[in-house]
């Protein structure tokens, strides 16, 4: 098996690992990916030939294609996602823990011969700008052409990364297989997967990932959630930085002053919409650095600096439209992959929310003619994968190796009651408690029940690679470093409803009105806020509401402290935090008692 491919690899450790894996998984061929456009076209051609990829109308979506996954492989599978640490308590109560030795043995059995009849693709990738002190290099071995094309969009990958790795550089080993070997002469299915044996496994002892059975997004594109969050969060704790499920935006006011904010929301709560927000208020500008992941490190001047480790967007399609997010539509106009959306007769894509009326003659995400009134035409978790460079509001500093200085951190979720539109933490410790207390109505990004309220601290519940209580502690530790100039922390909630069940706040581009208030607060404007037990709330007159038709009752609902609701909220958070036992930092317990005491 060590023939043509081995001469392309100068790194002996990498060469040896590829050889070991090849002996285990027995592929028909091995291919080192160079990341070129011609390679992308060739691999896409393989998918088109196999029937998994459908080219879109080049007049509407040049160099774009639609992929339909198996209905059994459509979202992240948290129940099959594992953190392996020597001691169970290091993984904590919010992760699925397995003994690393036992799990490695189990995976050896699953991976044995799993690439028979397939090509093993070697994907060298870099999370973060090449040659940045922030960056991590990984190598993903996969048998999925879909993963090759998606990783080309989502990461910096190929020959450049291999060169940067040199002959001795360290890298994260990421092994992936769809888990569907082919016998000689056996015809392949369009989307091979192995739903009964799915495993997405993270080994913190050697910072590696093994993923089996799923070809979908976060389960298979191992640079994304696996390396950039689950492994990176563990590394960040030991090295004094943060790996977070956050967007990063640059905001410029009419006077030309610019600030960078990071914001954390659970999946499908409007991260991409906020990251690409198009302001309605004259003179304001919002530019995007990233919509999903932020790596944040203390800089030489004591401020916290953030980079987006990704190279593309993996956005939820349903609900994205010219009204809600015109910049996202412009971003995925060309060179993009659409997964599990509907197809129009003229070779265009469609999903719920794209237009008010569906076009006639749609083919749904399963490949069947679609009838209005039945199941959705596009899967609720259907996606677009698009290069970050195509974003029309991309910030000039998007590729800065040093990152950008963060002046505000924002936490949000999907809450219909109690949580106000915006509030500012009274201290860093209080801000960490706001992050730890986050909960949200669940969405289609995870397999399971939709619409239930689930606790999702820091929107990191599925992504924190170690004990969440130790993670809270790590966040709190930043306050004890007196040389740091820490950003202010805010909570926001775009999803409050009135008694009739209607959203009170218009959301989308109007969220800039809240960002404007936060901007002014970071400039030290005292008179625009009032102090309450839950934090600083806007004075009603301080929010720019020009052009909005909000009643005084609506404004009161959005900006007041619902005492009984908050007492229930504190009790709920305290009850949830019992899962952490004695590991829960005392600071969080104290903050919850303070809020309760002051409310009473």
Curated annotation (Swiss-Prot):
- GO MF annotation, one: GTP binding
Q: Does the keyword Cytoplasm apply?
A: yes
Give GO BP annotations, semicolon-separated: cellular response to glucose stimulus; gluconeogenesis; glycerol biosynthetic process from pyruvate; oxaloacetate metabolic process; propionate catabolic process; response to lipid; response to starvation
Broad enzyme group: lyase
Q: Which domain of life is it from?
A: Bacteria
Where does the chain bind Mn(2+)? 225, 245, 292
Protein name as catalogued: Phosphoenolpyruvate carboxykinase [GTP]
From which source organism is this entry? Chlamydia caviae (strain ATCC VR-813 / DSM 19441 / 03DC25 / GPIC)
């Amino acid at each position: 098996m060590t023939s043509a491919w081995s001469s392309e690899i100068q790194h002996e450790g990498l060469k040896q690992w590829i050889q070991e894996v090849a002996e285990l998984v027995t592929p028909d061929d091995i291919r080192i990916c160079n990341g070129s456009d011609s390679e992308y076209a060739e691999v896409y051609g393989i998918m088109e030939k196999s029937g998994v990829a459908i080219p879109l109308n080049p007049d509407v979506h040049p160099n774009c294609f639609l992929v339909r996954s198996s209905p059994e492989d459509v979202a992240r599978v948290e129940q099959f996602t594992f953190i392996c640490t020597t001691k169970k308590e290091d993984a904590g109560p919010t992760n699925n823990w397995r003994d690393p030795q036992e799990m490695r043995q189990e995976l050896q059995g699953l991976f044995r011969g799993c690439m028979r009849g397939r090509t093993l693709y070697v994907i060298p990738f870099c999370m973060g700008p090449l040659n940045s002190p922030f960056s991590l290099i990984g190598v993903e071995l996969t048998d999925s052409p879909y993963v090759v094309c998606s990783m080309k969009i989502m990461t910096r990958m190929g020959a450049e990364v291999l060169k940067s790795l040199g002959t001795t550089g360290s890298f994260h080993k990421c092994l992936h297989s769809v888990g569907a070997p082919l016998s000689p002469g056996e015809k392949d299915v369009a989307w091979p997967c192995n739903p009964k044996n799915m495993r997405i496994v993270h080994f913190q002892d050697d910072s590696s990932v093994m993923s089996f059975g799923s070809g979908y997004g976060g389960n298979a594109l191992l640079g994304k959630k696996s390396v950039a969050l689950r492994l990176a969060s563990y590394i960040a704790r030991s090295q004094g930085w943060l790996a977070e499920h956050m967007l990063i935006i640059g905001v410029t006011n009419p006077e030309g002053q610019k600030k960078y904010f990071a914001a954390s929301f659970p999946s499908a709560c409007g991260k991409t919409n906020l990251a690409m927000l198009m302001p309605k208020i004259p003179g304001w500008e919002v530019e995007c650095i990233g919509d999903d992941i932020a790596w944040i490190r203390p800089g030489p001047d004591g401020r916290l600096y953030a980079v987006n480790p990704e190279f593309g967007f993996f956005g939820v399609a349903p609900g994205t439209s010219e009204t809600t997010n015109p910049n996202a539509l412009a971003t995925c106009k060309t060179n993009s992959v659409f997964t599990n959306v509907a197809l129009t007769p003229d070779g265009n894509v469609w999903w719920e929310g794209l237009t008010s009326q569906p076009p006639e003659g749609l083919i749904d995400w399963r490949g069947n003619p679609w009838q209005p009134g039945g199941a959705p035409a596009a899967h609720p978790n259907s996606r677009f994968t698009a290069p970050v460079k195509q974003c029309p509001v991309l910030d000039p500093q998007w590729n800065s190796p040093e990152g950008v200085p963060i002046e505000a951190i924002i936490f949000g979720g999907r809450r219909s009651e109690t949580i106000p539109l915006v509030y500012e933490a009274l201290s860093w410790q209080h801000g960490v408690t706001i992050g730890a207390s986050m909960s949200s109505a669940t969405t289609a990004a995870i397999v399971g029940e939709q619409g239930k309220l689930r606790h999702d601290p820091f929107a990191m519940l599925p992504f924190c690679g170690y004990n969440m209580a130790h993670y809270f502690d790590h966040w709190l530790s930043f306050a004890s470093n007196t040389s740091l100039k820490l950003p202010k922390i805010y909570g926001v909630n775009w999803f409050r409803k009135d008694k009739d069940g209607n959203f009170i706040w218009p959301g989308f581009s109007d969220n800039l009105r809240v960002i404007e208030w936060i901007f002014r607060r970071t400039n030290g404007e005292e008179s625009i806020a009032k102090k309450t037990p839950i934090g600083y709330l806007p004075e009603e007159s301080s929010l720019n509401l020009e052009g909005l038709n909000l009643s005084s009752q609506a404004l009161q609902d959005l900006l007041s402290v619902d005492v009984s609701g908050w007492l229930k909220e504190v009790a709920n958070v305290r009850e949830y935090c019992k899962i952490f036992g004695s590991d829960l930092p005392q600071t969080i317990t104290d903050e919850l008692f303070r809020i309760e005491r002051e409310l009473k």
